[in-house]
Amino acid sequence: MDKRHDPSRRIIAPTGTELSCKSWLTEAPLRMLMNNLHPDVAERPEDLVVYGGIGRAARDWECYDKIVEVLQRLEEDETLLVQSGKPVGVFKTHNNAPRVIIANSNLVPHWANWEHFNELDKKGLAMYGQMTAGSWIYIGSQGIVQGTYETFVAMAKQHFNGSSAGKWILTGGLGGMGGAQPLAGTMAGYSVLTCEVDETRIDFRLRTKYVDKKATTLDEALAMIDEANKSGKPVSVGLLANAADVFAELVERGITPDVVTDQTSAHDPLNGYLPQGWTLEQAIEMRKTDEAAVVKAAKQSMAVQVKAMLALQAAGAATTDYGNNIRQMAFEEGVENAFDFPGFVPAYVRPLFCEGIGPFRWVALSGDPEDIYKTDAKVKELIPDNPHLHNWLDMARERIAFQGLPSRICWVGLKDRARLALAFNEMVKNGELSAPVVIGRDHLDSGSVASPNRETESMLDGSDAVSDWPLMNALLNTASGATWVSLHHGGGVGMGFSQHSGVVIVADGTDDAAARLGRVLWNDPATGVMRHADAGYDIAKNCAKEQGLDLPMLEKATTEGK
């Protein structure tokens, strides 16, 4: 019997103000754990899989049930420890300590590879937490929409004189992360052709309005893109096809998109990427009987796709790796120049990270969309001079369907996170919001990740692989009073290639919450500014000085420079 598979389970988070736990500080992680497994949120909720190949919310259903049970009895001065999706201990702490501390899929570096992890996984000794799956703050594809949108806008500025009109994007993958691309692309003014091998994923994205149209042949998809470009009305098309096949065929035909990227689950060659010529059913069976053959075939197909991406780049396409480690997989398969196209962070996002700007998000525990709309208005009120941000909030309200509990993603930085959170807390206190909100972020943030093929690629000082930073981030957030803190390995790019930390905090309208919010949501983005200032980025150094950060070695460097 598979302890992870139970098709009878249908998990829906409670809403409203009635508590099933002893306080909002334990009710919040309970609801967010459940929300991660909502049928409109998770990719395979019956298997506890939230997104990203096998990114899970709990190790198995027995562990899930026990986590729920413990959260419902947890006292306000106790902390639950969750080890790779398994609740392993409850300890007396204090009321400003985290209620939950999570560690997922962390391995001693010598053994930090998929082969060793998969052995542990099969024995029921580990769980892949991805980033926000195992840390209980996934909000569906909206969680990556704005970051993807910001990247595509930056690409238009850098490559197309600021205009995406008549331009189109070629990409792959419509899973939990990749599913954001078509909507983000059309919001940024491009048409988007996304290849996906699983028709149910295309249909899901159609239903949730992340994709406009479905095509079953490349000719049909290209005709849709061509018509959209001629009419000036961007369209997103989900093409039922293998990305490696399509990318290579476009090279053969001499058709060059304006932008090329990919967000298949290439980080996990066993569970996340379908080899060319294989059916989904064939892959599922082969994973049970010959893992090595699946991995080899998947990497060979990735090599084909990356070679095509390089050829399209040479033909003039703006080409970028969108953080799934496909370049590394192709490199291991003999594509020596796989890294000739850049990752999206060093190419387009790092200046934002230097100011602590990243994917700030919040969720209405009430379940009432009006609570999110009221917070949208509060963000506009408190940040009145940012038309780009206002435009994002307007588009998000108009075009993004909530998945599970209503939520919002909003890229803001050190200057704004704490004051927004304190304003939300005041709105809970005075009754403007009908229930508390939880505030968190992706692990993809400025100070919370070490990932040499993604967030920390090509750091100015060569410190790409130094992972002290996310460890310090997690420890500082714990000391600052976050509601739950997580420390993961392998998210985004796979085993052996990243370490990263997450933080979530509850705004319940109390004075104690205000004190915690002020500490956590200042310190958390400040570690990102610190990390980039330490690496030598002038934007970060200037931000640190402007915001009065106490960075002893930066102060020394400034003094020496006088």
UniProtKB/Swiss-Prot annotation:
It catalyses: 4-imidazolone-5-propanoate = trans-urocanate + H2O. NAD(+) binds at residues 52-53, 130, 176-178, 196, 201, 242-243, 263-267, 273-274, 322, 492. Gene3D superfamilies: Urocanase like domains, Urocanase superfamily. The keyword Cytoplasm applies. Binds 1 NAD(+) per subunit. Pfam families: Urocanase, Urocanase_C, Urocanase_N. Transmembrane segments: none annotated. It is found in: Cytoplasm. The keyword Chloroplast does not apply. Its EC number is 4.2.1.49. It is an enzyme of class 4 (lyase). Keywords: Cytoplasm, Histidine metabolism, Lyase, NAD. Its main location: cytoplasm. It comes from the Bacteria. GO terms for biological process: L-histidine catabolic process to glutamate and formamide; L-histidine catabolic process to glutamate and formate. One of its GO terms (cellular component) is cytoplasm. The active site is at 410. Pathway: Amino-acid degradation; L-histidine degradation into L-glutamate; N-formimidoyl-L-glutamate from L-histidine: step 2/3. Its cofactor is NAD(+). GO terms for molecular function: urocanate hydratase activity. Belongs to the urocanase family. NCBIfam families: hutU, PRK05414.1. Catalyzes the conversion of urocanate to 4-imidazolone-5-propionate. This is Urocanate hydratase.
